[in-house]
Every structure is written in C-alpha cells, then in structure tokens.
From Swiss-Prot:
Compartments, as annotated in UniProt: Cytoplasm
Associated pathway: Amino-acid degradation; L-arginine degradation via ADI pathway; carbamoyl phosphate from L-arginine: step 1/2
Family: Belongs to the arginine deiminase family.
Cited Gene3D superfamilies: Arginine deiminase, L-arginine/glycine Amidinotransferase, Chain A
Organism: Staphylococcus aureus (strain JH9)
Superkingdom of the organism of origin: Bacteria
GO cellular component: cytoplasm
Protein name per its UniProtKB record: Arginine deiminase
Length: 411
C-alpha cells in the first residue's frame, strides 16, 4: 500500500512529520478563579512559553522532522465559505453553555476576521467585552461575573490528546472534560477539508461523535502489531473495545493485539504516557508507582478470535511479562523516573519526567529540569536532547504531550 499523509506504526520509528500548536493568547485568558475549569494549575508566561515552544520545534527540525502547526492547517481547511460557515456553527454548537443565546453577535464578530484570525480567536476565546450586548436573559444577570462567551482553549498546545495517529489512520477523540471537548473539531476539519489530507482516504478509527471518551495520551503504538491503551479517568474501556473492533475488522490494518492497561484516576496519572513511554526497542520510561504495582495490575490483552469471529480478552497482572510476550522481546528494561527515589521521582514525575518524545530508536526529547531522569537515561545508552520548559510544564505535559506524530518511518 502506498504511504499516505499519516503513517505511525511504532512509538520509536524515525519521526518525519509532527503536528504542533504554538501557545497563543489563550494562555493570557487564564485567570486564577477559573483555572480548575480549564484544567490548569498555574498561569504560564506566554512570551517565555512561546520561546520554549519555538525552541522545541527548532530542535525537531534540526533532527529532520517536518513541523506542521494545527492553527495554520485549520485556517487552510476553511477556505471554502460553506466549510467556514459549518465550522463556525460546529464551534458555537459546543459552546452553548457560555454563549447564552448570543450566537448572532458572535457570528458578526467572526465575519470581520480572516480565516487565520478566526481560528486564533476561537482558540484564544471570546471575552464578553468584545461583544458587549445588553443583558437580555435572566441567566446573564445571574452569571454576569463570568468573563467569556467562548472559553479559551489553553490545553491546545498538547496536540497529543484530541487525536491519535494509528497505522495509516487516526482517532478523532471525544475528550473527557468539557473544557477540552471542542479541541478535536480542528483535526476533524483538517482531515476532511485540507488539501494535504482530504483525498487520502484516511481511515477514521473513531470519530468525535463516539459516545465514549478517549484521549491520545492514552494511545501508544508499540509496534505494527500491538497497541497499548490506558484505561484512565479520561479514556474508557468502552472506547478501547470499540477501537479494537474497528481496527480488527479493517483488512488494511496490521494490528493484532490491543493491550489495555488500567492506571489510577488522578491528575498525577493523567494519561498512560505520563507514566510510561517507549524510547527504544526494549526500553521504557516508567513512573516508580507503576513499578511498585507490578504483579497487581489490571492488564487486558484484546485479540480477534478467528474461530468465534469475535474479540477474545485475556487478563494479566504483570506489565513486564505482558510487554515481553506481545512484543516478542526477551528482556524489557524499565527506567524509573527520578531513579525511583521517593523525592526525586515524585518531583520529576510532576514535571513530566516520564513523558519523553522518541524521535528515533534510542533518541528522546525531554525537559532539562528532570536531570535525575535524564542522567539515568544516558547511563542506559539513550541519547537525550534537552529543552527548557519552565513555563510549558505549568500545563502538566511534556514533549510527548506537546506533539502528535503524523508520519514515522517503519522499524
């Protein structure tokens, strides 16, 4: 089969094309009173966050990676006036809780904007002062203090989550939290309408109308045969089973097994990739809490049973044994965050020490602040490329969270 614009058959194959989102004005629309609702713990300093992100992108380019930007692709996808109108309608339809009946006033504002300005405005949010209509509904008098008609989308620079490249297809995800639910609208329009993608017949393994939640940070492509997916607060068992069935029934898909790994439902264990990432053929970074749970984990291996013409599910409690079995590797190495130290490990886990981006086998991008983890990776033969992330990390995501591979070389 001829390669299309999406091909990801591993976590470690040489990264050739990646999707990023440069932090924008949405970060400056974060205010302390509404941080929890927008899933932030702190407010990044935009100017520094942009410099850090620009350096991240430049590091990838220097390693031979083509960098695409979500905001640019989205604007290029709505050149057709009818598509632009449908895009606006879809965004507003998912913002009714805050719009309070002022769709027409917001559309009037949007009509004054270019396509790029429109996308940027939707991402950054619409303040009430930009519309400034008179209160016409009781709910507006009651909710007068809330400053937005359209919430900002500060999590967008974590492009890993609203979508996931799997094989030559993609999942367009239904996000768990309302604050992030609109994010996958952008990739939906990009895949359907952008010249680079629209005629490529890209399989949509799951779309954003799926009734079950799934997020890309829980979706790991371990090999052309094996997916690992976290069962987490943000990714449901129902979504994983639906994805497995869709992939198994597609004759062009190569995947034979889906490994579902249950992780705790807490912010520290937000997604599977915050506690567990593949960095070489036989090496994984690992949060020490996962290592301590070895032998008591809930792991499920989903396969297609040709005899019964249905999926079959096996259970395991040992992650190391499971990975060695499904990947056909004799001795997998787990490299603990912060060397497993009770203090260093907890601190570096909070700063996404396990959330490494592998750009080819044995070569990773990490935050420089996680020096204990980085030194240990080097001792294990891994080449570590460090980036600064003092502001970026305030969003609780690392290099893997901030990137969506679109194309990797096969291994």
């Amino acid at each position: 089969m001829t390669d299309g614009p999406i091909k990801v058959n591993s976590e470690i194959g040489a990264l050739k094309t990646v999707l990023l989102k440069r932090p924008g004005k949405e970060l400056e629309n974060l205010v302390p009173d509404y941080l929890d609702g927008l899933l932030f713990d702190d407010i990044p300093y935009l100017e520094v966050a942009q410099k850090e992100h620009d350096h991240f992108a430049q590091v990838l380019r220097e390693e031979g990676v083509e960098v695409l930007y979500l905001e640019k692709l989205a604007a290029e996808s709505i050149e057709n006036p009818q598509v632009r109108s449908e895009f606006i309608d879809d965004v507003l339809a998912e913002s009714k809780k805050t719009i309070l009946g002022h769709e027409e006033e917001i559309k009037t504002l949007f009509a004054t904007l270019s396509n790029q300005e429109l996308v940027d405005k939707i991402m950054s949010g619409v303040r009430k002062e930009e519309i400034n209509p008179k209160c016409t509904h009781l709910v507006e008098y009651m909710d007068d203090k809330y400053p937005f008609y359209l919430d900002p989308m500060p999590n967008l620079y974590f492009t890993r989550d609203p979508q996931a490249s799997i094989g030559h297809g993609i999942t367009i995800n239904r996000m768990f939290w309302r604050a992030r639910r609109r994010e996958s609208i952008f990739i939906q329009y990009i895949v359907k309408h952008h010249p680079r993608f629209k005629d490529a017949n890209i399989p949509i393994w799951l779309d954003r109308d799926c009734p079950f939640n799934i997020e890309g940070g829980d979706e790991l492509v371990l090999s052309k045969d094996v997916l690992a997916i976290g069962v987490s607060e943000r990714t449901s068992a129902q979504a994983i089973e639906k994805l497995a069935r869709r992939i198994f029934e597609n004759p062009q898909a190569t995947f034979k097994k889906v490994v579902a790994i249950e992780i705790p439902t807490s912010r520290t264990f937000m997604h599977l990739d915050t506690v567990f990432t593949m960095i070489d053929y036989d090496k994984f970074t690992m949060h020490s809490a996962i290592l301590k749970a070895e032998g008591n984990m809930n792991i499920f291996i989903i396969e297609y049973d040709d005899v019964n013409k249905d999926i079959a599910i096996k259970q395991s409690s040992h992650l190391k044994d499971t990975l060695e079995d499904v990947l056909g590797i004799d001795d997998i190495q787990f490299i603990p965050t912060g060397n497993g130290d009770v203090i260093d490990g907890a601190r570096e886990q909070w700063n996404d020490g396990s959330n490494t981006l592998c750009i080819r086998p044995g070569v990773v991008v990490t935050y420089d602040r996680n020096y204990v983890s980085n030194d240990l990776l080097r001792q294990k033969g891994i080449k570590v490329i460090e980036i600064s992330g003092s502001e970026l990390v305030r969003g609780r995501g690392g290099p893997r969270c901030m990137s969506q591979p679109l194309f990797r070389e096969d291994i």
